[in-house]
């Protein structure tokens, strides 16, 4: 809910943030963005292709991370609100951000490093148990940093224009983070991978991922946490959380009756009885499935189905992200011209075109760059539009907006983890690093996560066209 008109004698509005303060805030999520890019793009590839763990084992670890993230996100938000009176001098939000940052810094490098104390005779289940606690700690830290950083926006600024500006700066550094990860991955694969090739060794062997690439991913994770730690330090040095006033006690001039509001409040229990809540929620979930699963399985598709050199696991995701970033600038004018639903549908058409291209083409070759442009543009279109649809659904009911976002976030994270586990369970050679069946498996997995889920998203969109989102009026004094 936006601020009302200033009352007589009210304190003046806070001064706008300086450019340094705005930039300091914007870099506070840089570490999370770096880690998230590496987590979704390279975790399965590292565990299965480099560490030679079974496909089910790799999928189980990713599922553990997604479930831990989904559970920690609402719990951290609840505890952060409860602890608002703690750490008053430093700021409760910054304190939670610091806790999350430390957890991420201490746990993330171990996820992309060999199991300490494990040998050739160590059973796989023991290695998976070793990685499990580090993944849970990382996801707890990631959620703590994300929630505290987002909740700082209304603490730092009150003007809607400044809120949009902070969000835009935050997204700009997200772009920089993804470019940094993919650029560093390409550089490490190019330099460190080629330096290990002996003069008598076939050059094609150096283009295949394997145990020799463990230092590449270990160094990439160390680079990620090193750079992220510097930006997190800049955030804590340059961001000052404003002190919250204590709960206001009723005074002499406080009206006994609250003024009537034009719009009744929607509580969390009311959302559960709104069909539109489930319509938009399922659409958002399918959108996230397309975006995250295509990012997760793109590296596997490039490696096993197209047999491309390993540098492509860095260059193709980079092309996808740049394509999506550039296409996001077209979202506002397109939305104005054809509306939310048709904008989302246009993005789906682009993704379905990519899926059809992959399904029908025997080998893409260099054309994989053009396909990556299509997928990146389509994913950015449906993701931005689905977020706008969620904001439209909440509308003026911001008092329960956190419940809506939290519910949809929990649903999409758990669904992503379960989907990955299901795909990994169908892997034709779970006990081998790769076999002939992998070629067609990852080919059709890529078609399924884009085309198959895209069809499901189209059906959800049709339900919104047939039954537009309309919220009923609820009497907050009425019993549910």
From Swiss-Prot:
The answer to keyword Transmembrane applying to this record is yes
Lumenal topological domain residue ranges? 48-56, 119-124, 192-218, 303-310, 424-446
Matching InterPro entries: MFS_2 (IPR039672), MFS_trans_sf (IPR036259)
Supply the name of the protein: Major facilitator superfamily domain-containing protein 12
Q: Which CDD domains is this protein grouped with? A: MFS_MFSD12
What does this protein do, in the record's words? Transporter that mediates the import of cysteine into melanosomes, thereby regulating skin pigmentation. In melanosomes, cysteine import is required both for normal levels of cystine, the oxidized dimer of cysteine, and provide cysteine for the production of the cysteinyldopas used in pheomelanin synthesis, thereby regulating skin pigmentation. Also catalyzes import of cysteine into lysosomes in non-pigmented cells, regulating lysosomal cystine and cysteine storage, which is essnetial for redox homeostasis.
In the record, the note on similarity to other proteins reads: Belongs to the major facilitator superfamily.
Q: Which reaction does it catalyse?
A: L-cysteine(in) = L-cysteine(out)
Species of origin reads Homo sapiens
- Mainly localized where? membrane
| A GO cellular component annotation in the UniProt record | plasma membrane
Q: Impact of mutating residue 182 to H?
A: Influences skin pigmentation
> What is the protein's membrane topology class?
Multi-pass membrane protein
User: In this record, what's one Pfam family?
Assistant: MFS_2
Any one GO BP annotation for this protein:
cysteine transmembrane transport
Coiled-coil ranges from the UniProt annotation: none
Q: How would you summarize where this protein is expressed among tissues?
A: Widely expressed, with high expression in primary melanocytes.
Q: Which GO terms describe its molecular function?
A: cysteine transmembrane transporter activity; symporter activity
Transmembrane segments annotated in the record for this chain: 27-47, 57-77, 98-118, 125-145, 171-191, 219-239, 280-302, 311-331, 348-368, 369-389, 403-423, 447-467
Residues annotated with N-acetylmethionine modification: 1
What is the name of the gene encoding this protein? Answer: MFSD12
Q: Which UniProt keywords apply?
A: Acetylation, Amino-acid transport, Lysosome, Melanin biosynthesis, Membrane, Phosphoprotein, Transmembrane, Transmembrane helix, Transport
């Amino acid at each position: 809910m936006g601020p009302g008109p200033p009352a007589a004698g009210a304190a003046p509005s806070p001064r706008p943030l300086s450019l340094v303060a705005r930039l300091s805030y914007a870099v506070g999520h840089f570490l999370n963005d770096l880690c998230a890019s590496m987590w979704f793009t390279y975790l399965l590839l590292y565990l299965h292709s480099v560490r030679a763990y079974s496909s089910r084992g790799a999928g189980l670890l990713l599922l553990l991370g997604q479930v831990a993230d989904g559970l920690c996100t609402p719990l951290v938000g609840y505890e952060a609100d409860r602890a608002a009176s703690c750490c008053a001098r430093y700021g409760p939000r910054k304190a939670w951000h610091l806790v999350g940052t430390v957890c991420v810094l201490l746990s993330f490098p171990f996820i992309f490093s060999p199991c300490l104390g494990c040998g050739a005779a160590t059973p796989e289940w023991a290695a998976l148990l070793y990685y499990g606690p580090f993944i849970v700690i990382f996801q707890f830290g990631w959620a703590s940093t994300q929630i505290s950083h987002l909740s700082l926006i209304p603490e730092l600024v009150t003007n809607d224009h400044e809120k949009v500006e902070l969000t835009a700066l935050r997204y700009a550094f997200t772009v920089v983070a993804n470019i940094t990860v993919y650029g560093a991955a390409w550089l490490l694969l190019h330099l460190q991978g080629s330096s290990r090739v002996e003069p008598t060794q076939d050059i094609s062997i150096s283009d295949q991922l394997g145990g020799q690439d463990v230092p590449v991913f270990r160094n990439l994770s160390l680079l990620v946490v090193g750079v992220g730690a510097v930006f997190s330090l800049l955030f804590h040095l340059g961001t000052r959380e404003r002190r919250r006033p204590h709960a206001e006690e009723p005074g002499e001039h406080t009206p006994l009756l609250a003024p009537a509001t034009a719009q009744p409040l929607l509580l969390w229990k009311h959302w559960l009885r709104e069909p539109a809540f489930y319509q938009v929620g399922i659409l958002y979930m399918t959108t996230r499935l397309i975006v995250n699963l295509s990012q997760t399985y793109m590296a596997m598709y490039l490696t096993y189905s197209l047999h491309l050199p390993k540098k492509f696991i860095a260059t193709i995701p980079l092309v996808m992200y740049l394509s999506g970033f550039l296409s996001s600038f077209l979202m506002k004018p397109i939305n104005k011209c054809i509306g939310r639903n048709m904008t989302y549908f246009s993005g789906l058409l682009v993704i379905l075109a990519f899926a059809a291209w992959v399904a029908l083409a025997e080998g893409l070759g260099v054309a994989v760059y053009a396909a990556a442009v299509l997928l990146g543009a389509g994913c950015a279109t449906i993701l931005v539009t689905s977020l706008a649809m969620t904001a439209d659904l909440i509308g003026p009911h911001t008092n329960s907006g956190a419940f809506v976002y939290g519910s949809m976030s929990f649903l999409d994270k758990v669904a992503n983890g379960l989907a990955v586990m299901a795909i990994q369970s169908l892997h034709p050679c779970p006990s081998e690093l790769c076999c002939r069946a992998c070629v067609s498996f990852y080919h059709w997995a890529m078609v399924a996560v884009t085309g198959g889920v895209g069809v499901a998203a189209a059906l959800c969109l049709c339900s919104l066209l047939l039954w537009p989102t309309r919220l009923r009026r609820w009497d907050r004094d009425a019993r549910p």
